Amino acid sequence: MDPLTVYKNSVKQQIDSADLLVANLVNENFVLSEKLDTKATEIKQLQKQIDSLNAQVKELKTQTSQQAENSEVIKDLYEYLCNVRVHKSYEDDSGLWFDISQGTHSGGSSDDYSIMDYKLGFVKGQAQVTEVIYAPVLKQRSTEELYSLQSKLPEYLFETLSFPLSSLNQFYNKIAKSLNKKREKKDETE
C-alpha cells in the first residue's frame, strides 16, 4: 500500500476510535446524570423524612413537657389533699422505690408542723403478696424536729418495717393520724 492510503486509514482509525470514545463518554455522562438525579431525589425525600422526624421530636418534647407539668400538678394536688409528696421514684433489681415526705398542716403554730421523710419500696414478686418496705429517713433532721416527730409518732415508725401491700392504706392513715396529733410539750426540767 502506498503511504497516503496507510496514512488515510490510520487517520480514519483514529477518528473512529475518537468517535467511539466520545460516544462512550456521552453514554457515561448520561448514566452519571441519571444517577445524580436519582440521588438528588433521594436527598429530597430523606430531607422530607428528617423534617418530618424533627417535627415529631418537637411534638414529643412538647407532649413530654406537658406530661411533666401535669405530673407536677397531680403531685401538688396529692400534697394538698393528703400532705404526701413523692419526690422521686426509681426501680432496681429488688423492686420499685419512692422517696416520700408526709406532713401535716395543723393550722396552729409553725412549730407544730411535722414532716416525716421515708422511702417506700415495693418488692418484686407476685402481685397478690407484694411486700412493702418502709425505711424512715431521719439523717437531716434537727434535734427539735426529731423531738417533735418522736412526740407524735409511735416508736416503731423510726425503724425499717415491712408489711403486705394490702395494709398500705392503714400505714398511711397511721402516719397521718399520728402527725396530726398535737405536739406534746417538753418538760420544763429538761
Curated annotation (Swiss-Prot):
Subcellular location: Nucleus, Nucleolus; Chromosome, Centromere
Entries under CDD domains matching the protein: RWD_CSM1
Intrachain disulfide bonds: none
GO terms of molecular function: identical protein binding; microtubule site clamp
UniProt-listed InterPro entries: Csm1/Pcs1 (IPR040349), Csm1/Pcs1_C (IPR020981), Csm1/Pcs1_C_sf (IPR038608), Csm1_N (IPR041671)
Biological processes, Gene Ontology terms: attachment of mitotic spindle microtubules to kinetochore; homologous chromosome segregation; meiotic chromosome segregation; meiotic sister chromatid cohesion, centromeric; meiotic sister chromatid segregation; protein localization to nucleolar rDNA repeats; rDNA chromatin condensation; spindle attachment to meiosis I kinetochore
Top-level lineage group: Eukaryota
UniProt subunit comment: Component of the monopolin complex composed of at least CSM1, LRS4 and MAM1. The complex associates with the kinetochore. Interacts with CDC46, CDC47, GIC1, GIC2, MCM3 and NUR1.
Stated name of the protein: Monopolin complex subunit CSM1
Organism name: Saccharomyces cerevisiae (strain ATCC 204508 / S288c)
Gene that specifies this protein: CSM1
